[in-house]
Regions:
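A conserved acidic, glycine/proline-rich C-terminal tail/linker
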Residues: 244-260
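Short conserved beta-strand and strand-loop elements enriched in small hydrophobics
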Residues: 136, 231-236
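One-carbon transfer enzymes
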Residues: 1-228, 257-280
Length: 280
């Protein structure tokens, strides 16, 4: 299990690619999403995986098709004759004809079958789970429904999404190397579909908080889950950059007290201490 095609896009995937490189597996090709315009100036920016590939001197084997169904993609991967295809937050669905070329292993950021889909990290935090982890899965045509090859579990209590992304990417990188080294001896386990759950792609509007509807614990969960992007904000566009739960009770939307750290605001069934805000 030495010859690898890698598919991934964000920093989560780049850490996995880096460990594969350090472990001296033969990386035949790196597939990642096309460069995208970023910021107000719309500067064309490469994804994290491409940035790492350039740093490692692997830019000659980077491929960025708009779609894996594009002409020549299947033929190119097939011509490489990979032993395995490693997939981590690539951002495109692998079509059947690519899944058939070689075993495809996905590193999904949840303990499957929970949180199949696009936002497992944020969803676990939103649901106030104490545990999450990484599942190495043999890919099929379903949504994160393939057989389980290995998994690792982590206590996520109190973590925001940025912290959890970082820890899970390291965990995923280590699990990838383990799976690559032990692949031939692994006995896959079918997922128990009856216990499965799905999670949606995060949208900017998901960060909206309503003090008359959301409880203090719900606002805190949103703050942790949407840390960085989209963040949490009120209907008039004020963004809450730092906060914690308070133990005071009072009228919703009213300032209940002041402290050296900020001000305490009444919300549905409780209050929050707002430490830092940003105007619209």
């Amino acid at each position: 299990m030495k010859n690898i095609v890698f598919m991934g896009t964000p920093s989560y995937a780049s850490k996995i690619l880096e460990e594969i490189y350090k472990a001296k597996f033969n990386i035949l090709a790196i597939y990642t999403q096309p460069d995208k315009p970023v910021g107000r100036s719309q500067t064309l920016t490469p994804p994290d995986v491409k940035k790492l590939a350039i740093d490692l001197g692997l830019n000659d084997i980077v491929y960025q098709p708009k779609s894996l169904k594009d002409s020549g993609v299947k033929e190119h991967i097939k011509s490489l004759n990979p032993d395995i295809i490693i997939v981590a937050a690539y951002g495109q669905i692998l079509p059947r004809d690519i899944l058939d070329i070689a075993p495809c292993v996905n590193l999904h950021a949840s303990i499957l079958p929970a949180y199949r889909g696009a936002s497992p990290i944020q969803s676990a935090i939103l649901d106030k789970n104490s545990l999450s982890g990484i599942t190495a899965m043999a890919m099929n045509e379903g949504l994160d429904s393939g057989d389980i090859l290995a998994f690792s579990i982590l206590d996520i209590t109190g973590m925001n999404s940025y912290e959890l992304f970082d820890k899970l990417s390291i965990m995923a990188a280590n699990l990838t190397i383990k799976v690559l080294n032990e692949y031939k001896n692994i006995s896959p386990i079918k997922q128990f579909d009856a216990l499965s759950s799905k999670c949606k792609k995060i949208k900017k509007d998901d960060g909206l908080v309503d003090f008359s509807v959301d409880s203090a614990s719900q606002i805190w969960a949103k703050f942790l889950a949407y840390y960085g992007w989209p963040g949490i904000f009120t209907k008039n566009g004020i963004k809450i950059l730092d906060m914690e739960i308070s133990d005071l009770n009072g009228e919703v939307g009213k300032i209940l007290g002041l402290s050296d750290d900020g001000f305490i605001l009444g919300v549905n069934g409780g209050s929050i201490l707002i430490k830092k805000i940003q105007a619209a």
